[in-house]
Amino acid sequence: MCNAVTLPDHPISPTQFHNSVYNSPAAYWCIATQTRGPSPSLACAEASFPGALLSATANVFTHKQGVLLVVYDVESPKPFHKQYAIEFNCGIALVLMPSQSENTLAKLDINFQSRKTEEMDMALSPPLVKLISGNASAQPLRMLSAVASQDSREMFYDYLENSAVEVKINPCN
């Protein structure tokens, strides 16, 4: 598609190209549901999940309402694998709320760290490790694994240069 856009006879329409952009699903959802709230879209390669988690957390605190955090990416075409390989499709959604309810599974304490932090990773099963290494959008599986096992855990997600996002997870019983 990227090559086709540059060809003189334009074998791809601007609409087809527009629909391939990472924020078009959010835009179409907002139009269809007549939603007027914020709908940030981020593209930060391996740092997309920690960046989205920080952005969603800021929105929860700023607007005092729940946020649907969706991270996804699709398998990248072979020519892009040298630059940024995505081995399979993955999408994960989390609902972040400003206060606890009877449906709350865990309390998250999310902090920005202005320096890289020693990874305090939990033992993950080989299939989870493979998923996480094959698509950066699978990074929340670490957190979801802790929530599912109802364990209190602390983990770090590498963010931009010399920074990380710290997540402390405490289950709600």
Where on the chain are the PLM-derived regions?
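Active-site-proximal alpha-helical scaffold in enzymes
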Residues: 43-66
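Conserved "HGTGT" condensation-loop signature of ketosynthase/thiolase-family condensing enzymes
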Residues: 2-16, 22, 27-38, 72-173
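Conserved donor sugar-nucleotide recognition element shared by glycan-biosynthetic enzymes
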Residues: 21-22, 49
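Acidic, glycine-rich active-site loops and adjacent beta-strand->loop/helix elements
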Residues: 44-49, 71-77
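Conserved active-site beta-strand-loop modules that form the wall/rim of enzyme catalytic pockets
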Residues: 65-68, 93
